């Protein structure tokens, strides 16, 4: 069992609180799903599109204003609880239009998808 605080724990691992990247003995280790508590200052962005995505993703807006760019569509999350889901093979990028907190759930949890900071 593990009891924590998403904001405090996320700050220790680039926002991630559950997934394959946690130690095997940690209850937060999972190869099936990964969860991120993303805290983004206004203007924070993933300018480089994530390509060849092998996971399904769900993003839920907790607070702020957050835009997700998908092929042929721009999705604005602006009310608490707004969410977007996309499947495997869908490229994407994003920008925090205001300071935002976003809960991301992706499955499966696949190694090798980290994008370098600032990209």
Across the structure, where does each feature detected by a protein language model lie?
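Short, conserved beta-strand element in jelly-roll/cupin
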Residues: 40, 51-68
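Structural motif
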Residues: 65, 91, 99-101
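Short histidine-centered beta-strand/loop micro-motifs
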Residues: 27-29, 46-53, 70, 76-77, ...
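Short acidic-glycine-tyrosine-enriched beta hairpin
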Residues: 72-89
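A short, N-terminal "cap"/entry segment at the start of jelly-roll beta-barrel domains
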Residues: 1-42, 46-49, 118-119
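Double-stranded beta-helix
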Residues: 1-3, 12-15, 95-119
């Amino acid at each position: 069992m593990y009891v924590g605080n998403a904001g405090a724990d996320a700050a220790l691992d680039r926002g991630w609180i559950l997934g394959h990247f946690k130690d095997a003995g940690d209850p937060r280790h999972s190869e099936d799903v990964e969860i991120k508590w993303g805290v983004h200052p206004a203007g924070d962005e993933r300018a480089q599109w994530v390509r060849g995505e092998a996971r399904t993703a769900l993003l839920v807006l907790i607070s702020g204003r957050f835009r997700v760019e998908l092929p042929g569509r721009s999705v604005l999350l602006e009310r608490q609880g707004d969410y977007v889901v996309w499947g495997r093979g869908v490229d994407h990028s994003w920008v925090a239009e205001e300071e935002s907190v976003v809960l991301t759930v992706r499955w499966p949890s696949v190694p090798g998808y980290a994008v370098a900071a600032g990209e």
